[in-house]
C-alpha cells in the first residue's frame, strides 16, 4: 500500500502536486448532508453514532475525492468526558450550562479516559481508514485549550469573550489551572485518535486570534505547546497542524509551538510567511472561503496564486476557514479538480 499524498506532503517529502482538503468539507453546503440532517436533527447523534459520522465524513470523499478525509465531529466532543456536559442547538451553536467559573468547578473535573468517554471514535476512524485506503489520509482533530476554555467559561459562542478575559485578568491562577487540565485531556484525546487510525491531527484554536500578543503568550501559546509536546512524546512521527482564526499578529509564534504545519487564515500573505518560516515548518491554506462564491476564473486565479507561493516548501492547500453554508457545490468540485490538475 502506498503512502497517501497528504501524509507524504505533511512529512516534507517531495510530492507531485499540492494535496487538497477543506476545513468543513462535510457539512451544510452539501445537499446529501442536509438530507441526512433532516432525518437526524441532533448534531450529537450525527457526530456520535458511528454509522452517521462515517457516512457524513465520506460524503465529500465520494463527491470530490479530497486528499484528506477528516473525522466528522466537534471540538467539544471530549468535554463530557472530563465532567463538562454540552449540547449543540441548531442555529444557536454549543450551550454549556452551567458554565465553568469557579475553583470548585475546576477541582471537580476529572481526567479524560477517551475509550470510555468517546467509544464511538474508534469505529469511526477505523472504518474511515478502511474505506479510503491509500487514496486519502485520515485526519483527526481537537480544540485547543484556550478555545475550549472560552466555550466552557462563556457557556456559549461569544463575540467579545468578556467572561474568560475577565477571569484571565482577575483570577489568572484559576484560568491557568483550568487550561492545564484541558491541555492534558486534549493531548490524551489526540493520542487516542491516532491510536484509532488518524494519520494526521489538527489542533483548532479558533478563538486565540481574539487575544493580544501578550495574552496569547500567557494563556494560549504555552498550552498549545503542552498539547503538542505530549502528543509528540508518544507519536513523534505523526504530523500535527495548528489552526488559529485571525492569526496575523501572532503567526510567527505559531511555528514556535513545535507543530509540523501552520494553517493560515486568508488575512495572512502566505508567500511572506513562507519566507519567514524555516523549511521544517509546513504551511496550510489559505483561500478566503467566500471566493468559492466567485466565478470560476476568479477562483482559479486566486487559488493558483496561493499555490505558487505555498508549493515552494512543505505545503497543503486548504481554505483560510471552513466552507461556508450556501457555497455552490459545483465550485467546490471545480476547486478540487483544478488543484488536482496541477500534477
From Swiss-Prot:
PANTHER family: METHYLTETRAHYDROFOLATE:HOMOCYSTEINE METHYLTRANSFERASE RELATED (PTHR21091), UROPORPHYRINOGEN DECARBOXYLASE (PTHR21091:SF169)
Site (Transition state stabilizer): 74
Protein role: Catalyzes the decarboxylation of four acetate groups of uroporphyrinogen-III to yield coproporphyrinogen-III.
A Pfam family that the UniProt record links to this protein: URO-D
Listed EC numbers: 4.1.1.37
Catalytic activity: uroporphyrinogen III + 4 H(+) = coproporphyrinogen III + 4 CO2
Gene3D superfamilies for this protein: 3.20.20.210
UniProt record similarity statement: Belongs to the uroporphyrinogen decarboxylase family.
Domain of life of the native organism: Bacteria
GO annotations of cellular component type: cytoplasm
Pathway named in the protein's UniProt entry: Porphyrin-containing compound metabolism; protoporphyrin-IX biosynthesis; coproporphyrinogen-III from 5-aminolevulinate: step 4/4
Subunit structure: Homodimer.
Disulphide bridges, residue numbers: none
UniProt subcellular location: Cytoplasm
Protein name: Uroporphyrinogen decarboxylase
Binding site for substrate: 24-28, 43, 74, 151, 206, 321
Gene Ontology biological-process entries: protoporphyrinogen IX biosynthetic process
UniProt keywords, alphabetically: Cytoplasm, Decarboxylase, Lyase, Porphyrin biosynthesis
Record-level Gene Ontology MF annotations: uroporphyrinogen decarboxylase activity
Lineage: Bacteria, Bacillati, Cyanobacteriota, Cyanophyceae, Acaryochloridales
Amino acid at each position: 500500500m502506498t503512502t497517501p499524498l497528504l501524509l507524504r506532503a505533511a512529512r516534507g517529502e517531495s510530492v507531485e502536486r499540492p494535496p487538497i482538503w477543506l476545513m468543513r468539507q462535510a457539512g451544510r453546503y452539501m445537499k446529501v448532508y442536509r438530507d441526512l440532517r433532516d432525518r437526524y436533527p441532533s448534531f450529537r447523534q450525527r457526530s456520535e453514532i458511528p454509522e452517521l459520522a462515517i457516512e457524513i465524513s465520506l460524503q465529500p470523499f465520494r463527491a470530490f475525492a479530497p486528499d484528506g478525509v477528516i473525522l466528522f465531529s466537534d471540538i467539544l466532543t471530549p468535554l463530557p468526558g472530563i465532567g463538562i456536559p454540552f449540547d449543540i442547538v441548531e442555529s444557536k451553536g454549543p450551550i454549556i450550562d452551567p458554565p465553568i467559573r469557579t475553583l470548585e468547578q475546576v477541582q471537580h473535573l476529572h481526567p479524560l479516559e477517551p475509550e470510555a468517554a468517546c467509544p464511538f471514535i474508534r469505529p469511526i476512524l477505523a472504518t474511515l481508514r478502511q474505506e479510503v485506503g491509500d487514496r486519502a489520509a485520515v485526519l483527526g482533530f481537537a480544540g485547543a485549550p484556550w478555545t475550549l476554555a472560552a466555550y466552557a467559561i462563556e457557556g456559549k459562542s461569544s463575540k467579545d469573550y468578556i467572561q474568560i478575559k475577565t477571569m484571565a485578568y482577575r483570577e489568572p491562577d484559576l484560568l491557568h489551572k483550568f487550561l492545564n487540565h484541558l491541555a492534558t485531556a486534549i493531548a490524551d484525546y489526540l493520542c487516542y485518535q491516532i491510536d484509532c487510525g488518524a494519520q494526521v491531527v489538527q489542533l483548532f484554536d479558533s478563538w486565540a486570534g481574539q487575544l493580544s500578543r501578550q495574552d496569547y503568550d500567557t494563556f494560549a501559546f504555552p498550552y498549545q505547546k503542552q498539547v503538542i509536546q505530549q502528543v509528540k512524546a508518544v507519536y513523534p512521527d505523526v504530523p500535527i497542524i495548528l489552526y488559529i482564526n485571525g492569526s496575523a499578529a501572532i503567526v510567527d509564534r505559531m511555528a514556535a509551538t513545535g507543530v509540523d504545519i501552520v494553517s493560515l487564515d486568508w488575512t495572512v500573505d502566505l508567500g511572506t510567511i513562507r519566507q519567514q518560516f524555516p523549511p521544517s515548518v509546513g504551511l496550510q491554506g489559505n483561500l478566503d472561503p467566500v471566493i468559492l462564491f466567485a466565478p470560476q476564473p476568479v477562483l482559479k486565479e486566486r487559488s493558483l496564486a496561493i499555490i505558487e507561493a505555498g508549493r515552494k516548501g512543505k505545503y497543503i492547500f486548504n481554505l483560510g476557514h471552513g466552507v461556508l453554508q450556501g457555497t455552490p457545490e459545483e465550485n467546490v468540485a471545480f476547486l478540487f479538480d483544478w488543484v488536482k490538475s496541477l500534477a
